């Protein structure tokens, strides 16, 4: 299929020339379908807090607080596409009001009433195609939607992850393929579940990369049962690429950034702050996208990367990424430790020049903050790269690091990972002070 040559839907937010924004999309090797910025589901759907056609759709309200905190007019914010950026989507399966058939979408704001959103301007066109294919199967086989009030019904959620064999950013590949996961209201895989999966695969053809099942019969709002994954068809794992093109693999239940354009830009910028030949530790690593990105940057020539992650479920994907590294030298430089970051903070900061932290929304644990601000901290550690998805917790952590006198904030910028929401990712660099709190650990 020849990609259609269509103009990207790019919005220039306040104070940013449209020409500057256009350069972002010009780097892409593929194209995506043009879509209208206005969304018919807004404001009922809870996915966005700002209309996509608003002038400030790419300036989340929290950005004003970010700029005020840093007090620096030079604070830079990366804004990518306003539409078609989402390459991973989880849609609830509930009953269509008129027919009772399966409908897919997000919940209306402040409720658990479904707003059908199978067409969504922020989602990759493949997400819409996967939703339509899944619904066709549900209609043909009489699949019943989950009913929260009774706990009955078969299908609870559908997850779609877009994966491109060609592009670094799947959002720029109209021919990206879909990995579809079905969350069934059951605790055992049945032949019917398999028939539903295989019907989706048959209808989707080459478009469907793989189909998996998650068995979740708990009466709760938790979407996935992390012990309930079953691979049924095709490829089990998906992947994103590092800026160098190296594949980093993900399981269906792995945490994965939904906006590969913005995440890829973060990965491209981080190496600027890593000295050549560094020993790197990545805490809260997940499957290791940041660490593997630094490892495969030939200009950095990092000596080692240690990945620290609390969940053992990442090991299978991490090992596949390691095994596909291009040579034994790179493979020998990586290691994975399954442990809570705060439990091994002291040992992790020894023989470490650069510490990467990408914590959950709550930020760094108090005990980890104590280690990083204690005068006995290993003299090896000279740089902290902090990726934050929760600005309030970042402010607390940054204030403590700087107040200790041991760390200086030397760089800060932000990234809009979720356009039209009140969410911002902050990337900050802290350098070790040379005159306070330096003590050689023997």
What label would you give each PLM region?
Residues 83-87, 100, 174-177, 422-423:
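A short, glycine/Asx- and small/polar-enriched loop/turn
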Residues 114-157, 162-163, 184-212, 219:
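Internal alpha/beta scaffold segment
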Residues 160, 169-186, 247-251:
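Short, aliphatic-rich beta-strand segments
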Residues 1-17:
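N-terminal chloroplast transit peptides
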Residues 43-46, 102-121:
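Residues forming anionic-ligand binding surfaces in small-molecule and nucleic-acid pockets
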Residues 73-96, 155, 161-164:
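Composition-driven low-complexity segments enriched in polar/acidic and proline residues
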Residues 28-64, 83-84:
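Cysteine-cluster motifs in flexible loop/terminal segments that predominantly coordinate metals
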